[in-house]
Amino acid sequence: MNQHVSIHEGDRLAKRNALILTGAQALGGANPAIIVSLGGLVGTQLASDKTFATVPVSLLQLGIAAGVIPAAMLMRRLGRRGGYLIGALVGASGASVAAAGVVTRDFALFCLGTFICGLYGSFVQSYRFAAADTASPAFKARAISWVMLGGLAAGVIGPQSVFWTRDLTPSAPFAASFLAQGALALLAILVVSQLHAPPVAAVKADRGRPLGEIMRQPKFVASVIAALVAYGLMSFVMTSAPIAMVACGHSVGEAALGIQWHVLAMYGPSFFTGRLIERFGKEGVTIAGLALTALAAVVGLSGLSVAHFWIALVLLGLGWNLGFIGATSLVTDCYRPEERVKVQAANDFLVFGSVAIASFSSGGLVSHGGWDTVNWMVFPPVAIALGLVAWQRFQRKAAPAAV
């Protein structure tokens, strides 16, 4: 009876935290949505060499990768709530620097701003793990899915902020959009201040197994590779798409709307992704997400109309949702409670490091190789990730007693 009450109370806290983090994700998730919508376009205006147009977006991803380990160390010392409050302040500062770069037409300053915004993103990306920290095993996948659902609102808030503010500063187009981004980060402070996370002392009591031992687990390897392929390819194609659309004669508005539909597709399925995982398993959902990513590339290779771009971007978003949430859920099975901080940080460093590399390479590739080349590059990594996850699924079903 007492055990039942404990589990019930634990999931009550987990649900409360998941809802708070969903709101924080809605505000913090607008941070990359705004930079992805505008980064390449502003980069084209400010960079002397158009090959570097996507560098601001790439630096956003690099900032996320660079920030995950310091963010984890900070949260280990201050707790989740303290770390997230500092992260939101960093986000507001980065947006202000980016706006200053636009106003002064200083490409380097603008890039610095997007990098700092990436540091904020490293905190935001850990919201999904924070939601799982207090959840029972039965509720973990759904808690992660709830938080990712906040990105659905971010997919509206970010692009709509651009539409509402882009013309407020005619002498410095889009500067007001980045100031709005900073205001959203400040609003996130009010939300994350309500978070009740486990005491840091509970994490410090036992450091668990060495990180190398954990990372050598075949399941961890398959999970991380699936996550970095799902996220890396999404960033790779998404960063190239607006540039390719404009190069094909489509309008900036059509490109921005394509990104909005893409972001909505990224987070919209979170209404039911947790239930899909309960029904079909973590590996099954991850495999479905990777297959949708490959299908997006097939559509991208089929034509250059607005419809082709939009459908490809929607499929890409759906694939990211299923693939990344499924892979994240798999990662949570690879560590003990006392190991979570270091394993989550290692996972995110690997994932967002690959995303940064993908984003850096996409600008030059779409400029010199074209949109078709970008899409052909999708298939090899998807095949590798599919093989690894499918093998793990086969192993689990073949030896259920060992699980």
Language-model segments: residues:
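C-terminal membrane-cytosol helix-exit motif in multi-pass small-molecule transporters
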Residues: V162-F163, G182-A202, L388-R393
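Juxtamembrane intracellular "pre-TM" segments in multi-pass secondary transporters
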Residues: N2-K15, H196-I225
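Intracellular juxtamembrane helix-capping segments at the cytosolic ends
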Residues: G39, G121-A135, L322-Y335
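Cytoplasmic helix-loop-helix junction between adjacent transmembrane helices
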Residues: C111-L149
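C-terminal ends and interior cores of transmembrane alpha-helices
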Residues: L89-T104, L292-L304
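Helix-to-loop junctions at the C-terminal end of transmembrane segments
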Residues: G67-R80, P269-K282, V366
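A membrane-interface helix-boundary motif in multi-pass transporters
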Residues: R81-G82, W164-A183, G364-V382
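Hydrophobic core of transmembrane alpha-helices in multi-pass small-molecule transporters
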Residues: A26, F107-S122, H308-L322
